[in-house]
Amino acid sequence: MRKVGLRIDVDTWRGTQQGVPHLLEILSLHGIQATFFVSVGPDNMGRHLWRLVKPQFLWKILRSKAASLYGWDILLAGTAWPGRQIGAGNADIISAAADHHEVGLHAWDHFAWQTWAGVWDNAHLEKHIRLGLDSLSQIIEQPVTCSAVAGWRADQRVVKAKESFGFRYNSDCRGTTPFRPVLADGSTGTVQIPVTLPTWDEVIGEGVSRENYNRFILDRIKQDTGTPVYTIHAEVEGIVMRKHFSELLEMAAQEGITFCPLSELLPDDLSTLPLGKVVRGAIPGREGWLGCQQLIDH
């Protein structure tokens, strides 16, 4: 059996309200547990519309048919009106997810983090983490043990900012295998579990269609030479593409692929993990910079 970490990002009000319940039902049907990373503050995702002036982002919107995929309520959220508080308005749903799955912090304000985290100082980074952490721990009535920044917008500054919160692990970057990030003083920080596989919106329309996506991603899992981690989004696989996602899980089981929460990918002895850093980089299909794993050779 090939073990794959299944990460579910929840970015918006609609993704929480509609997508998460669908995904909980699908996962229960297939007997699978996953890790949900949830956004709990204001839903301002519609403010990303200004990025349409950037050719790469515009092409992504066009090839993924974003309006039909996400819905106009997501694409316009927080533009003409204040963004709704996701956690406060959907606490029962988030709590239900935590009853059966690992739940970690994604963001307080997903839009703000994705847009400004690259220039915020440490105090501002810590403020947003604290806001999200306090809200989420109150909702699920237990400590939050893991986190994953919005849009993989992370570097060594973000790694440092998270150190005081005592997470068991973070999943802030793209890469190949879990590692221990080296801090500026030479010590090692909280373990990172990178995402290794592409997401739906990164590849659809780039030679990959809705019809052959499941086959594409299963083949990529089999080709993965590291520790495979796959990310889906409640706004996509939990709503419009939920039938496709259920079919993916069925196909995976038939082909000897099993999914698990990210924490189950960690070894008992974390000191056996390689050392590395989170550096800014780029990947095909995603506009702008994002955190990438850089392993340190001994």
Curated annotation (Swiss-Prot):
Keyword annotations of the record: Antibiotic resistance, Hydrolase, Lipid A biosynthesis, Lipid biosynthesis, Lipid metabolism, Lipopolysaccharide biosynthesis
Protein name: Probable 4-deoxy-4-formamido-L-arabinose-phosphoundecaprenol deformylase ArnD
An example molecular function term from Gene Ontology annotations: hydrolase activity, acting on carbon-nitrogen (but not peptide) bonds, in linear amides
Its job: Catalyzes the deformylation of 4-deoxy-4-formamido-L-arabinose-phosphoundecaprenol to 4-amino-4-deoxy-L-arabinose-phosphoundecaprenol. The modified arabinose is attached to lipid A and is required for resistance to polymyxin and cationic antimicrobial peptides.
Similarity field: Belongs to the polysaccharide deacetylase family. ArnD deformylase subfamily.
Pfam families in UniProt: Polysacc_deac_1
GO biological process terms on file: 4-amino-4-deoxy-alpha-L-arabinopyranosyl undecaprenyl phosphate biosynthetic process; lipid A biosynthetic process; lipopolysaccharide biosynthetic process; response to antibiotic
Entry EC no(s): 3.5.1.n3
Disulfide links within the chain: none
